[in-house]
Design a protein with these regions (language model features):
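Polar, enzyme-active/binding microenvironments
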Residues: 1-229
Length: 229
């Protein structure tokens, strides 16, 4: 069992040995709790610490040393906060910086080395005062990227996981969408589907982590849809 019943929209990240689950909601309450569990032993999660804010629908991502939570929604507003923790050391999350846009329900992803936001944020499920929602993200090496959001955002942002600081501009998606899906490899991040917002779209576009710039067309989904896992 988790330390706290956060049935609605918590987000998780981890290392090779430890998994972390943070935030979430059990209506009407929002939580900041970070749960910790080790992969090699069965049993209940233990209290790791707390996020800086009680919230849900964040993006979560990390490398082998750090875990990060970005964006999300509190009981009163969408936020652009990025928190981080050191996975090996329990404690309260520390400020990393801010997203360029306020977003909830981002996507995230990372490889086994270092990736940002997101083991890819869900809903799709990966950024500031504009109240963006449902971005997607991916990461490789020490870079994590985020894209999309409410208001049909086409903005792609990135951060460097090993340091701290605000997210910066990476480029633009080929189409502005809400609630796309995100995935990636060690070379590319791919964004699929979403809502524009009058209708779902079937667009798939991609960027390469090492080459900042606008996304390029990859192809199309078999059906137009949003909130892909």
């Amino acid at each position: 069992d988790l330390v706290q019943n956060t049935a609605s929209c918590p987000q998780g990240c981890g290392s090779f040995t430890r998994g972390l689950n943070g935030g979430g909601q059990a209506s009407p309450s929002y939580f900041s709790t970070i749960n910790s569990f080790n992969y090699d032993s069965l049993g209940n999660a233990v209290d790791f610490g707390d996020l800086s804010q009680a919230r849900r629908l964040m993006a979560a991502f990390g490398d082998t040393q750090r875990g990060c939570w970005a964006g999300g929604i509190t009981p009163s507003a969408n936020v652009n906060t990025i928190d981080f923790i050191t996975i090996a050391s329990a404690g309260t999350a520390t400020d990393f910086g801010d997203l360029n846009e306020v977003k909830d329900s981002p996507q995230s992803g990372s490889d086994s080395h270092q990736g940002l936001e997101e083991f890819f944020p869900r809903a799709p499920e990966l950024y500031s005062p504009t109240g963006k929602v449902l971005p997607s993200g991916g990461g490789v090496g020490d870079i994590g990227i985020f894209a999309g959001g409410n208001g049909t955002s086409n903005i792609i942002q990135f951060i460097t996981i090993a340091s701290t600081g605000n997210a910066v501009d990476f480029g633009d998606k080929t189409v502005g969408v809400f609630s796309p899906g995100g995935l990636g490899s060690t070379v590319r991040a791919v964004f699929a589907g979403g809502e524009d917002p009058s209708a779902n779209v079937d667009t798939i576009d991609y960027v390469e982590f090492r080459s900042k710039g606008n996304a390029a067309d990859f192809g199309n989904l078999t059906a137009a849809r949003r909130a892909l896992a």
